Structures are given as structure tokens and as C-alpha cells.
Swiss-Prot record:
Pathway: Purine metabolism; GMP biosynthesis; GMP from XMP (L-Gln route): step 1/1
Keyword annotations of the record: ATP-binding, Glutamine amidotransferase, GMP biosynthesis, Ligase, Nucleotide-binding, Purine biosynthesis
Catalytic activity: XMP + L-glutamine + ATP + H2O = GMP + L-glutamate + AMP + diphosphate + 2 H(+)
Chain ranges of the GMPS ATP-PPase domain: 203-395
Pfam families: GATase, GMP_synt_C, NAD_synthase
Protein name: GMP synthase [glutamine-hydrolyzing]
Stored HAMAP family: GMP_synthase
Major enzyme class: ligase
SUPFAM superfamilies: Adenine nucleotide alpha hydrolases-like, Class I glutamine amidotransferase-like, GMP synthetase C-terminal dimerisation domain
Entry-linked CDD domains: GATase1_GMP_Synthase, GMP_synthase_C
EC identifiers of the protein: 6.3.5.2
UniProt superkingdom: Bacteria
Organism: Rhizobium leguminosarum bv. trifolii (strain WSM2304)
tRNA processing among keywords: no
Amino acid sequence: MTQTAHPDSVLIVDFGSQVTQLIARRVREAGVYCEIVPFQSAEEGFNRLQPKAVILSGSPASTVDEGSPRAPQIVFDSGLPVFGICYGQQTMCMQLGGKVESGHHREFGRAFLDVDKDCQLFEGLWSSGSRHQVWMSHGDRVTALPDGFEVVATSSNAPYAFIADEKRKYYGVQFHPEVVHTPDGAKLIGNFIHNIAGIKGDWSMSAYRQKAVDEIRKQVGDKRVICALSGGVDSSVAALLIHEAVGDQLTCILVDHGLMRKDEAANVVAMFREHYNLHLLHVDASDRFIGELEGVSDPETKRKIIGRLFIETFEEEAKKLGGADFLGQGTLYPDVIESVSFTGGPSVTIKSHHNVGGLPERMKMQLVEPLRELFKDEVRALGRELGLPDSFIGRHPFPGPGLAIRCPGGISREKLEILREADAIYLDEIRKAGLYDAIWQAFAVLLPVQTVGVMGDGRTYEFVCALRAVTSVDGMTADFYHYDMEFLGRAATRIINEVRGINRVVYDVTSKPPGTIEWE
């Protein structure tokens, strides 16, 4: 059995909760490496990772239903500290001899926890007699504790809201400490990791960088690697890491589909060629892409055309180079986590980047994915470690299909150029106002609508530009950014005055849900 090279790590057993990734985020924020494994393969994951502690996640399942998920017995036989969250608490109790019943009073949302007794997990945080806000989301509840456990905190609807077996270092909570609505939740998880499990928390991007470089060198040897460089943070960090490991054995290919932001392709090429000495091939395929996209209005059809053309173009350029044995990709950890079905086997849903999906199979190449253990914020930290400037690392997310999905309806070179100029002015105003880093994502959209206007003494009939800006933590939910009207007026005036083809500007005040961040 191959063991993962992380001597101080935490195993998270996933029972299908929608917020399991947040548990991993909290553990990583505490400076400790962790992995999420579905309950069906948790024993294999345990043996491979050799963790110092185990966390059991929540689940939409009910512990009282026949065939509901269970933790592998090795978790409890190992003598390691265990932290059960919501469903994780319930299955731990049942497996150790306690009882769980379907609750008559379901508890969802904010609740208040009354601490009845001091415990090691509360050290430096909570004390007996105090009250704290937590976030509940459960129907079942524990009704009888296993031997060795005691209640340390309760809520109005959960008499076993926080239980502990201090001798065996088993802890169970009915609430969700991983969500931001439990203000002290991250600290509780940190206490479990550091104080209870005795893990130092010295996992760093510097250590990850060296480990990744060593692994790339071992995997690649003296063979060649090609990497699809989009200009985004993920592919850029992956390319720099691979280049650090194998140097000139790496060739990067930037397929310029003509759908990037103003001057973006030129800036990316200049940065990587001049500052990082990467062997970078810049392929101008804009005529090919825009030619096939012209007149196509369905957004999904646009995406499919762009994905197909990217694969074809990349494949052709790679063949001109004589091929390669390995393909470098900026795959992140959320892309490779298995989605867990608690009623059956795990259904693996690996999201392929729109423009590299299918390439390894078609070109018979092995994947090099040096970021596959990292979350997005960790990739940014690694980028800083590698010397990428904050101005690049902190850029707003940009979709793979580019401006094609910010131009609803049919596209043309003329429309793309209008949109490119409007978007550049909008982002320039945001930066001048010092708002760029406070906004998750901001962009302009060129609507397939023309309106009547008056400019000078003449009548105009030109396009409408919509401005979009949102705040978000992870992109899963988002709220529109609350600009002051003076800023919006200034940005709109510049766009109308400086961009020929636009005579009206509107601001999108839709949150996600019900809307999405992008328009298509």
C-alpha cells in the first residue's frame, strides 16, 4: 500500500454532506494537511494516509435507516482522536453502543449552545456556564450515550449537542463547526487538531512546493511535458511549478481564441517569456474560433464549439512540436473529490477544464497535476511562493469560454471589440476607486439589445452594456456589490463617451441564487 507523504495529517470521512469541503478548508487553515475520502473507501484511505486524527462529516442520510453509511471500524480500533460532526456524531454513537432516534423537533439554522461542563476541546475558548451561537441542521438526534461519554453542552432541542469521551479523545457535536455561522467553529476544529491530536500545524506552501517539485521530477524523469497555459492563476502556477522541476523539458502552449480581455494574451506572453524564461508558444487561432462561433446564440453550443476547437488546435500544435509524454494541468482538489451517494457507490464527478478535457486520452499522454491537492486560496499562496505578483494572483476569475459567454446571443469581431473596450474601462474605474480587491468578480456584458439614444444633435441606435460585480467567499453563492451611485455614473459616462457602439449602461443587481454570476 502506497502511503501519502504527509506524516501529520487528518482524514475526513465523507458521508455526503454538502459542506464537507468546508471541514477540509478549516483543517488546512489550521496549517494541517487533510484529505476527504468517501465512506465507502475510507478504510483504504486510512491505511494509505496514516492520519493522526479522523473527522466524520455530516450527511443527508438518517442513521436510523437500514443501510445508512457507517465509519470503518478501523477508525475506532486505531486509538486515534475522532471528531464526529452532526451525522458523524450520530453514527459514532450508534457504532459505539449508543442510541439515535428520528427527532420530533427538527433543528435548522441558528441555535445557542449552553456549556455545562469544561472539556479539553474548549481550552482557551469556552468555559462552563457560557453560551455560544452555533449552526444546526439535523432531524435525528442522540438519545443515549455510549459508555465513557458525557454531555458537555446542550441546546434547547439537542440535549446531546456536544458530547465527549475525554479518555479516548472522542468528541461529537450536533451542530456544524465548519460553517461561518458558527463563529467559534474554526477554533474548535483547530483545538481538536492541535490540542487533542497534538498536530503542530506546520504544513506550508514552501514545504508543498518542494514536495511537488520532487514528485514531478520523479514522475517525468527526462521526458517532455506540454502544458496548456490559459493565462489564469491555476494553469500559470502549475506551469511555473513544472518548469521549476524540469526546466526546458516543459513547453507551454497558449491558444489565443480571440475571446480574452483587452491585451491579456500579450501581457501573459510577455510575463512568462521575459520574467520566467518559459518556452511558450503563442498560437493566434482567433479567426478559427470566431469564424465558427459567429451567429451561434445558444450558450451551451458556444461552450462545446470552444472546447472542441481548443482540443483540435492544441493537438495540432503539440504534434508540430513532436509530441510529449506528459500533459500538465492545473487541476485543483475540488475537481477530484468524489461526490458521495449515501444510497449506493460513489459517483466520481471529475470536472474537466473546458479546453483540456479529452486531451490525455486522444494524445496518449500521462497527466501531471501538481495542484490536485490544493484549494483555490492555497494555489494563490503557492503562486506568491513562486514569485507571481499579487496583481496577477489576485485577478478576478475569468471563464474558459471567455468573452463569448459575456456577449449573449450571436457574437462577431465587432461585438467582441466593443465589449473588450467597455470591460477594460469598467475594470480601470474599479481599480482607480480602490475597489478591485473588495469585489469577487466584476465584468461588462454586451447585451443583444439596441436602444435609441441622443449624442450631440444626432439620434443613435446602439447596444446596451450591463455591468456586473459580486461579492462572494467561494463563488457558490454571491451578492451584487453595492456601489455608490457616483461610481456607477462615472463608469457609465466613460463607457458611453469612449466606446463607439454603446449608448446605454445598466447595472445588474441579481444575487446568486436565483441568478448565476455569469450571464451565460
